Amino acid sequence: MEAPKHVNNACVIPNLTLKKMREIELDFPSKKIQEKIATILDTFTELSAELRERKKQYAFYRDYLLNQENIRKIYGANIPFETFQVKDICEIRRGRAITKAYIRNNPGENPVYSAATTNDGELGRIKDCDFDGEYITWTTNGYAGVVFYRNGKFNASQDCGVLKVKNKKICTKFLSFLLKIEAPKFVHNLASRPKLSQKVMAEIELSFPPLEIQEKIADILFAFEKLCNDLVEGIPAEVEMRKKQLDYYQNFLFNWVQEQKTQLEQIM
């Protein structure tokens, strides 16, 4: 924190000399407090690393189980695959304009999903219900190409696309997992805001094994995803607790430094 404040930026190459480093003055609390703060900071690093590792593990197994070659290794070399475009197997719709003011004025139990990716994409809850059943949503703007499986009553904003499977050969959950891998590849990043339009989504081609196998794979991935999410959700809670601890000690240190300065001024 302190060393960067003493870097000489007037040179062509900014530098911090050994002489200047030796002259930096630092205030220290008791060794016990120092060790406590160091432990909290170490925990931050460990939890962040674990969070990244959990997400990598899930992505690896998801991609492995959805790979055609691996499906044939597991379920049989002669397993047939059929290829469809999204428009051939789904009804494709888009949400409507739902403002934050509308959400405030029409509170209810049904979620409104938007182009947000945090909080499962939920913007708020209203009494309306535009969709009821098993669907897939995707973000069309901003964080475009993020796919969610939905099951129940909900609403979608205008930045959210909605798919309803109409082909009896297709498992909605399985399709959602496939699209989580494939949809981001079709995001248009040249615009000021990344986009994945209804037209582009409609043209995406995907290959499917028989329905029975789709359902087996989807059940495995759904259970694994839930397990990973439960673990991952526990990590941010731990991080938040550690942050509160760190804030406490930062405030303690600040007050301690101020007290030292006041005492020094009184002596002088």
Curated annotation (Swiss-Prot):
The keyword Electron transport does not apply. Belongs to the type-I restriction system S methylase family. This is Putative type I specificity subunit S.MpnORF365P. The specificity (S) subunit of a type I methyltransferase (MTase); this subunit dictates DNA sequence specificity. The single R subunit has multiple frameshifts and is probably not expressed. The methyltransferase is composed of M and S polypeptides. Keywords: DNA-binding, Restriction system. Gene3D superfamilies: DNA methylase specificity domains. It comes from Mycoplasma pneumoniae (strain ATCC 29342 / M129 / Subtype 1) (Mycoplasmoides pneumoniae). One of its GO terms (biological process) is DNA restriction-modification system. CDD domains: RMtype1_S_Fco49512ORF2615P-TRD2-CR2_like (cd17255). It comes from the Bacteria. Induction: Detected at low levels after 6 but not 96 hours growth (at protein level). The keyword DNA-binding applies. Pfam families: Methylase_S (PF01420). Contains two DNA recognition domains, each specifying recognition of one of the two defined components of the target sequence. GO terms for molecular function: DNA binding.
